Swiss-Prot record:
Pfam families, per the entry: VirK (PF06903)
Top-level lineage group: Bacteria
Name of the protein in its database record: Uncharacterized protein in pinF2 3'region
Lineage: Bacteria, Pseudomonadati, Pseudomonadota, Alphaproteobacteria, Hyphomicrobiales
InterPro entries documented for this protein: Uncharacterised_VirK (IPR010694)
Keywords for the protein's UniProt record, in alphabetical order: Plasmid
Length: 145
């Protein structure tokens, strides 16, 4: 019994290591599309400090985050598009909803845009923020092998 317990503990301790080793970085749009169309869970992490402001009134930022791609669209020109929306509160404690859109083009360049709305009216709050990123430069994609 003691030997079985020791073996089980070893298996349980090794499982997270195996799972972490099983994650693959997707470095091209075709790798990302292949993983998505195969039904694999694809995660994207964002580091906006590595991206450039896309319009003049977008400030530089060190914001980072991530999400799992749940729904996506591939357009006729090969652009991969997906979005995230979340409900939160602003610095004044008032409810807002943020919509974040990602568009990845076949050359690996990407547009990241965010629009914020006051709740419950959906009145636009401020201006849109836009950043120019790229695969492996501000945006990283990972999926199981």
């Amino acid at each position: 019994m003691k030997r079985i317990s020791t073996i089980l503990v070893g298996v349980f301790l090794a499982t997270p290591v195996y799972a972490a080793d099983n994650i693959h970085t997707l470095g091209t749009l075709s790798e990302i599309e292949l993983a998505l169309t195969a039904g694999k869970p694809v995660n994207v992490t964002v580091d906006l400090s590595l991206c450039n402001p896309g319009v003049a009134d977008t400030p530089a930022t060190k914001t980072r985050g991530g999400m799992r791609i749940d729904a996506y669209r591939i357009t006729a020109d090969g652009t991969l598009a997906f979005a995230d929306q979340h409900f939160t509160i602003d610095r004044d404690g008032k409810p807002i909803t943020q919509f974040i859109r990602y568009q990845i083009r076949s050359n690996g360049e990407a547009d990241f845009t965010m629009v914020t709305f006051n709740m419950p009216t959906y009145e636009r709050k401020g201006t849109s923020l836009a950043y120019k990123c790229a695969i492996d430069h501000g945006l990283s994609f990972r999926a199981p092998q």
